[in-house]
A protein has these predicted regions:
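A generic beta-sheet turn/junction motif
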Residues: 40-42
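Short beta-strand scaffold segments in enzyme catalytic cores
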Residues: 45-49
Length: 214
């Protein structure tokens, strides 16, 4: 691995840490590192089920923000860059609003893009939760969670206004294999994974320091 060689060339030790596990270290710290962490990336979404600091299940789904952008662009007949700009910058985009609440005139390009983004966000969240349920049901070993668990989200794709409300609408507790306490967006979601990596690095450094003292 080229990046590993570069880092180690500067005298650092490297450790591979999955994106969703790093997010769990940051987002589940107030719940005894127990719960579900979902990192909503551009190319894919990464999921980790953690129990008391140990990852019991982790996987990825090959859909993310880019999947939304590409499908909206195809449906609306516009460049992907235009869709991305609307998704990331439009003050009118709110996933909780219906089409009739838009100030844009029906049929305008902006109007069509915003409503297509809403539709594909709902499809992405539904796909994500369906896959998570499937992974739970087919896993050989899943912890027996004694209490309801939190689900934390991070990553740029989760930053669109109204995203957490869409998650709540798509979620069906009766069909989900474990009880869920709540859904939250981790603070400063863009840097949450990096902070989780830092926490793990600091912990390793402390443990190595204690070993040397012994």
């Amino acid at each position: 691995d080229v990046l590993k060689q570069i880092i180690e060339g500067y005298g650092y030790k490297t450790k591979v840490l999955e994106e969703s596990i790093a997010l769990a270290y940051e987002g589940l710290v107030d719940n005894d590192l127990t719960g579900i962490a979902i990192s909503m990336g551009a190319g894919m979404c990464n999921i980790c089920v953690m129990y008391q600091g140990m990852s019991s299940l982790s996987f990825s789904v090959a859909r993310g923000g880019d999947w939304i952008d590409q499908n909206v662009a195809n449906d609306c007949g516009c460049p992907v860059a235009k869709v991305t700009a609307v998704k990331e910058n439009s003050s009118q985009l709110d996933l909780t609003k219906s089409a009739i609440n838009d100030i844009y005139q029906e049929g305008s390009e902006e109007y069509n893009i915003i409503n297509a983004i809403r539709s594909y966000y709902g499809a992405l969240v539904n796909y994500l939760l369906t896959n998570l349920t499937h992974q739970f049901n087919n896993a050989e070993s899943v912890p027996n969670f004694p209490d309801k668990v939190p689900v934390v989200f991070g990553g740029g794709t989760a930053l669109v206004k109204g995203f957490m409300e869409v998650v709540g609408e798509q979620f069906n507790q009766e069909e989900f294999p474990i009880p869920v306490k709540d859904f939250t967006l981790v603070e400063d979601a863009h840097t949450a994974v990096a902070r989780g990596c830092l926490s793990e690095a600091q912990l390793i450094e402390e443990e190595e320091g204690e070993t040397k003292e012994e």
